[in-house]
Amino acid sequence: LLRSKQPVNFRFEGVEYRITIEEVAVFPQGYAALMTETGLLQDEPSMLLMDLGGWTVDLMRIDNAIPAADTAHSLELGMIRCVDDIREQVRRETGLSLTDAQIENMLAGQPCTVSDTVRDIVNRQGRKYTEHLLSATMEAGFDLHAIPAVLLGGGASVVSRHLSPKDGLCKTIFLLDDKVNAVGFERALAAVSRRKNEVLSCYLRPKVEANLHLRNCLADTKIFCGNTL
């Protein structure tokens, strides 16, 4: 779409749009979400980013506000597997067949008309899933007792309800807004565009002043993976 320079036509919420893509910026999805909580990047020298999606849980360590790409790792422990396991356990113990919506509501602590027995099974399995996730993360080489973890994505709310003090985690931060990635992308792009404009303005300044300003601009971009420009 970027190479063709041709207009793109689409409909969103009943409104027709016609756009031309002029520039593309790429950010790691979970890392972009941290743009909504920039204080986390400034306060912690290292943290683990855990994006709990439908099929996978994507892990990546952040060191000094920069994603450590060589630590990226995916676990096949997404929420689809969690829901499927719960459905099978409920069927095995009670003979009932729950829907995805029922299971997801109970995992999120929302109302659902079921027996206490079924609810207990769902909560027990939610805790089991959380324990399995923590164990798999540790086995992947991330010491959750030593570094803070930032959790986001659809499964983050499930883990937030089933953690226990006995897990002994260093620190957990939950980004539960389902729009957090979209907001993060918007803020990251705005910041990068601002930095580019500042660097461009250097060429319009006297040489000595421009060199100093350019160094400052480049130093500030490290929060965006160190290779924004």
Can you say where each PLM-predicted feature lies in the sequence?
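Active-site-proximal alpha-helical scaffolds that flank and shape metal-associated catalytic sites
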Residues: 50-54
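Acidic, metal/cofactor-coordinating or nucleic-acid-engaging core segments within structured domains
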Residues: 90-93
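A short beta-strand motif that forms part of the nucleic acid-binding face
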Residues: 63-65
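Nucleotide/phosphate-binding catalytic cleft detector across ATP-hydrolyzing
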Residues: 1-47, 67-81, 101-149, 153-224
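P-loop NTP-binding/switch modules centered on Walker-like glycine-rich loops
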Residues: 86
